[in-house]
UniProtKB/Swiss-Prot annotation:
Protein name per its UniProtKB record: tRNA uridine 5-carboxymethylaminomethyl modification enzyme MnmG
Biological process terms in GO annotation: tRNA methylation; tRNA wobble uridine modification
Protein task: NAD-binding protein involved in the addition of a carboxymethylaminomethyl (cmnm) group at the wobble position (U34) of certain tRNAs, forming tRNA-cmnm(5)s(2)U34.
Subunit and interaction comment: Homodimer. Heterotetramer of two MnmE and two MnmG subunits.
Gene: mnmG
Principal subcellular localization: cytoplasm
Subcellular location: Cytoplasm
SUPFAM superfamilies: FAD/NAD(P)-binding domain (SSF51905)
Amino acid sequence: MRYNAGSYDIVVIGAGHAGCEAGLAAARMGCKTLVCTLTLDSVAMMPCNPNIGGTAKGHLVREIDALGGEMGVNIDHTFIQSKMLNTSKGPAVHSLRAQADKKKYQERMKKVLETQENLHLRQLEVVSVEVEDGKVKGVLTKNGAFFECKAVIMTSGTYLQSRIIIGDVSYSQGPNGLSNANELSKSLIDLGIDLRRFKTGTPARINKRSVDFSKMIEQPGDEEIIPFSFISGNIDRDQVSCWLTYTNEETHKVIQENIHRSPMYNGSIKGVGPRYCPSIEDKVMRFQDKDRHQIFIEPEGDDTEEMYVGGMSSSLPEDVQVQMIKTVPGLENAEIMRTAYAIEYDCIDPTQLKASLEFKNIDGFFSAGQINGSSGYEEAGAQGIVAGINAALKVQGKDPMILTRSDGYVGVLIDDLITKGTNEPYRMMTSRAEYRLLLRQDNADFRLTEIGHNVGLVTEERWNKFKERKQNLERELERLKELQITNKTENNEKIVELGSTELKKPIRMYELIKRPELDYFSLACLDPERPDLPKDIGDQINIIARYEGYIQTQLEQVAQFKKFEKKVLPEDLDYNDVNSLRIEAIQKLNKIRPLNIGQASRISGVSPADISVLLIFLEHYRKTGKNTDN
């Protein structure tokens, strides 16, 4: 029986990585927030890989943290290994990755939600979102409780009508043996929301006691632990190792002989899978020239024997999985504790969303995370914090926070989803960011903390720490640009000792740092009055000095980009009325409804010629007295 259960400013549907960030952001901004989850035991659950960060994903975590989110702080408290990836490459692609203790990660995040002022965490299944006159009115739960609210954030992950597939066995269930949600999809369809079917998967978990690590290559963490959060400070902690092994011809033979039993290849799976995280059977069949594939054996926590078999995601039958795993060096006697599986689920077409992550046609209804067609904990968390901030701003009667492609990877992620859409689970990569030298993980706070403070999410403690860090960097850069190093014999002897060439004339310290064989730290011997600063300040100085020319070039590109972003398109424009646009462009523009010329130019099917037509139209529109330039 239906009953009125109370009213909230904001209701969040789901408490995965998107839901946690959304709920915390909304509550911390002063909104009375209800976070609903199918089970309280799955808050911030990591049903697949036991790590946070990685290439491009580490950037997202740093940006979530810079805005005032929780993911970075949470992993800093609960990681069991820390590693900086891509250190042999340029700073734009350096990415932090941390192995998590999955249970401790969940437990701490749940505690944060439970103790957050303005936030109510409840075990409830939402079966419908109720809308009246195009505006959200509330949500109805399976138990008949109706919660009135001003905004709803849907962060339902991979649970909507989800189906587990293992070989020829399939059944209705959520990830990791949990129940799914089979009723909410109908409510979304009734609201006119387009759904599609995606697929993802996870590898088996094996018992640590059954693994022969002597046949594998040890992968220890870094000696120097770099935290994800800008407010975590120095971390000193014992770390565990991961282990590397490889598939071989025997592994591939087992897969090839049983490929007809794979639901990926016999048509049982209809959903589209992730291109950049293929199953082991997909890798073996698609890349038959490769005689081996990497397999990482990763611990899932300090208090469990479960090991994650990274690189071996599969939907093959259980008996084939056993054969396959036992062919891998070190896994000959492996005992499977959890079987690998594929999971199909409903998700939305994200082009139905605005840049604020609010549905275009439903006032007050936001969506974030894997329900939007993305993959990964970090992509989910990034969307979650944006949706949470914007739902709170909506309730407060304020303008939304819109992050652009030049603001951060979060902006790139959202712009790609809402502008281009996705036909497969979307994964963030550094190659997707055209301004990646500006969007480094080390400067996320310089790019986004002020934005987080302006919307009311960043705490005063974090804000004061940021201001001190910014002041330290700016003062030190200014000092280095003024400090002159003379070419006297004593200085030249030290420079030669460092492997560089003598000075012919005096030079500023800032210019000397640009020499590839020197850096800020090694030149301390020529700088006796140098202030005692944190190491990360020195790291930033090295990057700023060495890449100054490239950074300036990208800043100029951003200035050009922003010119197009400022050319705002009328919200109510019918593109059928714009003369000379091609039919495909008219269809795409009417569907996506871009905010500005910049976004329009990134829509697939809109050509440079179409953009020229729109620019002429806007100029005429402006001259007739309607201003479209902010």
